[in-house]
């Protein structure tokens, strides 16, 4: 692919999430989040018993980290304001002003170094107490407490920050925690899962509404989705139908209400058919239609390939795989450490779908990166890791983002996951994603 010039208005940055980089320093009793709850109840399943207590210690190193980002030529940095840290009491609505000053200084450092702050308001860091009282996002009360939190954050920072995102990958902790049972709270409860999905979508309308007074300041609000393109094994009708259902349950469940203002009718029919339909109030659908997001972030790592089921789905509880089976394409390019396929052209497919099916809403690649286990094997005699594999991965995806922009898709940036090695759920630091290596012994 030919070299491409990066447009002046195209953001290049890195992404992070609070619980994966900050650690728990500065947090007070009662400010535990989902991540601490996950680790504290099941430390033995986390790689090397490493959890979110320290993470990569951004809390103490943010000034030097941000300065180094800028020295790399970055023009943006996406981070999370951690709900559990920001609120001293998330139920009573009491703000922790120590946290306010910490985040204010982070924003100041980003702008001082010539970068655009991009803020996610929730990256799985729901306060732990809301799990104990309301079953997390399954409880409707959580929607209103989230709204209370969002209003408090916007009141503090609307003048300094213009690019806001209500959620990052809202589906992942729900699917892993309530559908597949591999993350906290380790359930196989599809009805609860779809209730939680619905409540996150409803909560987004509250955030959109809360943002309205600040639109005149140039503020915009979006959502960052783990939007994984779905590809059928073949053009046969049964494989095409399998891909249709995988896309319906994994992509359109969020994309359609966020961008079209309504759920796909086929999705609602299937939820009713499988006794998984969520509870709602009629006014909820009116709000979903009225209060839509301004932009979209796309977290893309790998495609999903599916085929028609060859054996009947025989589990006791519903799962979307009732309608399809995963398919591994022979001869694919893939990351052997994670088992994830590498398919850069999917970025073009994503961009053209947004252009053609979703009114060409502004969007950017909000996460893209490659996790490698045992990177020490690539260390050279000077002590640096020769990560040409990472350079090739990032270059290929960035080139596609620029390509699809040139095709008329409204792509405004590309953000790498991540700047420095960060903690992941269960895998901890097993797979390294950073542009910079983190020495766990020295920090």
Annotate each language-model stretch with its function:
Residues 2-46, 70, 90-91, 100-443:
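Active-site region of glycoside hydrolase catalytic domains
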